[in-house]
């Protein structure tokens, strides 16, 4: 995180995947303090536990959308408060096994739900989260200029 901060210019934007232990663990409060002091937390996307299992990592993680701002601006934001985009994704479209077996949407009869081209639709919430972000970004001034 510190190295990313060093690489970014002022008002630079970044996204980083972090284990949830960094965001919630009592022993890592200093990391959260570092982030909050130096970055505007524009958004947090909580990922399901099984997200990285097919790649060998058994860890719950989140994506942080951050913007580097100067210390004066950060002090003002932290004093006045600001909104952030938050979303909790529960369905990733595949099973939490080493193969990442795809999971498709099914109806109440147990039949696959198909799109307009006759293809099975993945059972995932990433698309909805992306739409939510796009709407949020269009309505709110999320990135400081």
Q: What is the predicted role of each segment?
A:
Residues 1-145:
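A conserved structural/catalytic subdomain of Rossmann-like adenosyl-cofactor enzymes
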């Amino acid at each position: 995180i510190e190295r990313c901060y060093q690489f970014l210019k002022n008002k630079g934007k970044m996204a980083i995947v972090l284990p949830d232990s960094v965001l919630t663990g009592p022993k890592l409060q200093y990391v959260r303090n570092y982030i909050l002091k130096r970055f505007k937390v524009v958004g947090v996307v909580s990922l399901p536990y099984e997200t990285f299992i097919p790649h060998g990592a058994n860890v719950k993680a989140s994506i942080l959308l951050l913007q580097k701002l100067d210390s004066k601006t950060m002090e003002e934001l932290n004093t006045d408060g600001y909104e952030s985009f938050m979303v909790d994704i529960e369905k990733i479209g595949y099973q939490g096994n080493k193969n990442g077996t795809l999971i498709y949407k099914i109806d109440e009869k147990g039949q696959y739900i198909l799109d307009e081209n006759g293809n099975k639709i993945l059972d995932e919430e990433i698309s909805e989260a992306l739409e939510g972000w796009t709407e949020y970004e269009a309505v709110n001034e999320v990135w400081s200029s």
